[in-house]
């Protein structure tokens, strides 16, 4: 818990020192470069297959960060960045401007809405908004916001309306350490305390959070 609090303190200090960062991606160029992406993420950025993430409406800075780290995962043999058998290979031929253009394009689109099953609303809302102090689990809303919109400056992703199946898989990867490109291991430190049921409830809850 102390590690998470320290990470947030460092992050907030860095953000206060700089009001914003210029993002020089080109939306039109990104649209032209996105044809290959559409196979998995959909022509409008809303992945038709739920194991792939929706990219529409995601923060450009976050998309750019993930693309650079996916490429780093491949070039380092998984020692750095984020390693994914499919996406790391797809990111390999992209140069820096390609990544910025793609990020700008997908962030300009609208993410499709999802729904939250009634049977997880109460438990999901409690865990997301308040966490679980007894187990040392902080509120998800502390970083991702009360509506799950995240933060562009902090590079915390928008997680509301995301496919539950994708959220579930990423929380499991953070928990078991197969994904480790989170700031100071914050997501691993949180996910390792989540049960399978917690992850299932949160994933479904986020599907319709707005």
Q: Where is each model-derived feature located?
A:
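Gram-negative bacterial Sec-dependent N-terminal signal peptides
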Residues: 1-21
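Electrostatic cytochrome c docking/interface patches
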Residues: 18-34, 48-51, 108-133
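The feature marks the first
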Residues: 23-73
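Sequence context surrounding c-type heme c attachment/ligation sites in exported
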Residues: 28-35, 129-141, 160-169, 196
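The canonical Cys-X-X-Cys-His
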Residues: 37-43, 102, 137-146, 202
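Axial heme c-ligation environment in periplasmic c-type cytochrome domains
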Residues: 48-56, 70-116, 152-158, 175-201, ...
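Predominantly soluble domains enriched in secretory-pathway, periplasmic, or organellar proteins
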Residues: 64, 108, 123-130, 141, ...
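Surface-exposed interaction/gating patches
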Residues: 113-154, 160
């Amino acid at each position: 818990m102390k590690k998470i609090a320290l990470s947030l303190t460092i992050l907030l200090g860095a953000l206060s020192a700089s009001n914003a960062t210029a993002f020089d991606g080109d939306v039109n160029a990104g649209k032209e470069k996105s044809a290959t992406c559409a196979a998995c993420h959909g022509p409008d950025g809303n992945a038709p297959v739920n194991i792939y993430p929706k990219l529409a409406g995601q923060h450009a800075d976050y998309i750019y960060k993930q693309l650079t780290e996916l490429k780093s995962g491949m070039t380092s043999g998984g020692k750095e960045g984020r390693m994914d058998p499919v996406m790391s290979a797809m990111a390999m031929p992209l140069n820096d401007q390609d990544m910025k253009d793609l990020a700008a394009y997908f962030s300009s689109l609208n993410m499709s809405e999802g729904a939250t099953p009634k049977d997880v609303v109460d438990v999901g809302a409690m865990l997301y908004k308040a966490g679980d102090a007894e187990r040392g689990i902080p509120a998800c809303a502390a970083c991702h916001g009360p509506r799950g919109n995240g933060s562009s400056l902090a590079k915390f992703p928008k997680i509301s309306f995301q496919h539950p199946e994708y959220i579930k898989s990423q929380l499991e990867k953070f928990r078991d350490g197969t994904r480790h490109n989170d700031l100071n291991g914050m997501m691993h430190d949180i996910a390792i305390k989540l049960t399978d049921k917690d992850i299932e409830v949160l994933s479904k809850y986020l599907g319709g959070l707005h």
